Amino acid sequence: MKKLPFTIIHKNTNVDFFFDLHKETKCSKQVGEISEELINIVDKFIKKNPTTSDGDLFQALALLIATRVYISPFENRKILNMLFTMTEEGLSNIELGKKSKIGNS
């Protein structure tokens, strides 16, 4: 299985992990670039709008995903099932990642 090395920084903690890519991934580099771009956009929005609730953010992400699933040429239910499975695996990948404190915390 292909793995994408990825790093997240949250609350003075650095997490290095490997995200399990789908077996039919065409370009792991683009997966990483798109992910990084979307995460940065969300982070910038949250910094400008600190009262944004997690619920509102997750609804916005759900709308984004629903839109992309709808306009894709694939069967919606199969894509949603794949996304759910990949999200669960992604959470496991992050949990298994190497965590290290950064800064003076």
Where are these regions (language model features)?
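Solvent-exposed interaction surfaces and binding hotspots enriched for charged
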Residues: 1-105
